[in-house]
């Protein structure tokens, strides 16, 4: 038992928040039409450009990441146009749900949970369907931990000047290299509650000039998520409607830290946490679920006879550690550990120790301490390589 109760969040999101961000979010909200907030808003936009690695403007919306996904689709797909959807899990399936909701004709590349979509598959679909006008995909599929070859897929899409590439990078930003301008990514969607270390409530979209040309001629009705209306307002340091003021105040504090440490070091931190967790899991003889893993999430398959729900319950009730199970078709079959947010190796090491006990008491056969030793060895080697 924990005599002093303290919750530690190792889920894919929401994630542990930066204390300075929480402190700023608790300050009395600024007036969003006054100059002091406009100046703060512009500073946040400039900071986001550095995280996204883009010179294009980054719009800030008061909604979840799913709202950002919806905005990216309804503003770019005119009635009668066809989209290519790249689907590798539950959040890829959200592209399907959005397209079907708005009556958008679609071609779908769908792979089994745990797999990644290959650039050659995207190239083949574009060749077979020359009327495709946009490609929608995830950088990392949160439901499985799988990572797509974003750079390789972008290279195939860029062979078609008339096609835009829209990327859900909600768990990719800050955990995986995302080079928006260098790779030619037209719209990249982010969310505040992941590697940015602040509460939910803000979606961010970087938008290329090629994407803006499509948005300007898109005849699909939209209101709250009208990016043209937002672009006009945000050029003046404000949003079209009331923004998530407190979250933006917290986001400014988080960006101050991220830019001070360096965006690449934020990615390196996620790489370290993921590598340590996977070293332990492999030491226990368990299988990492996805064929190609990103750094945002580690998904693994417990031994036969070990109930993931019992492991999660013990982690929560006995240690105050929150981890996640599977989603969609993998519900009840895998466990997922998040590596984004405000935590470090010491916390990851403690989580591994707790997980060893929970797995053992749920029926797994493993040596207590073996995973921690594997994680420590990984940490030592990681430090030597930096």
Predicted regions and their residues:
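A glycine-/small-polar-enriched, mobile loop at the entrance of the PLP active site in fold-type I
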Residues: 6-62, 66
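Buried hydrophobic positions in well-ordered alpha/beta secondary-structure cores of metabolic enzymes
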Residues: 13, 25-26, 65, 99, ...
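Conserved beta-loop-alpha segment that forms the PLP phosphate-binding cup at the N-terminus of a helix
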Residues: 55-84, 88, 92-96
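Conserved PLP-binding catalytic core of the aspartate aminotransferase-like
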Residues: 287-318
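PLP-dependent enzyme catalytic core of the Aspartate aminotransferase-like
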Residues: 329, 333-386
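Active-site C-terminal subdomain of aminotransferase-like
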Residues: 16-17, 193-279, 283
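Conserved active-site segment immediately N-terminal to the catalytic lysine
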Residues: 181-193
